[in-house]
Amino acid sequence: MVTGELKSKIDNLWEIFWTGGLTNPLDVIEQMTYLMFIRDLDDADNIHAKEAAMLGLPHKSIFAGEIQIGDRKIDGSQLKWSTFHDFPAAKMYSTMQEWVFPFIKNLHGDKESAYSKYMGDAIFKVPTPLMLDKIVTTMDAIYEQMEQIKSADTRGDVCLLYTSPSPRD
């Protein structure tokens, strides 16, 4: 069940995209999906690390150690949503554009995999650091609200609201 407060936050997220110049609903949905994936990747990695620790099993984080993108390297922890969401807007934007997005595009090393084929043409379209900062802050608030609700169907309801361009209703 989506509350009025949660719907308002989702409407606000749409508004950020629209006022920031991304007015094509398909582009907005695409960018939201990429950002949700990036956040969920961090969450899933954290959950797997906790489960492995509880069971006394080894865990190899996808963010562990140095990550090579092209001919450059970065500490993998810098690619985690939980790390870069606290960066100043300009640093967050450059990290997303130069590191995080290329990282998710090449996450599956096999160039022939379905993942690689779908992500191969992916483009980060958020035009400004301030806009990305607002989007990330709003998405964090949405995820926090979803966690408080803890309803099994909330995630699906939120995805439906993400895909309906509310500000134009």
Features from the language model and the residues they span:
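Non-catalytic, mostly N-terminal accessory regions of nucleic-acid modification and defense proteins
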Residues: 1-164, 168
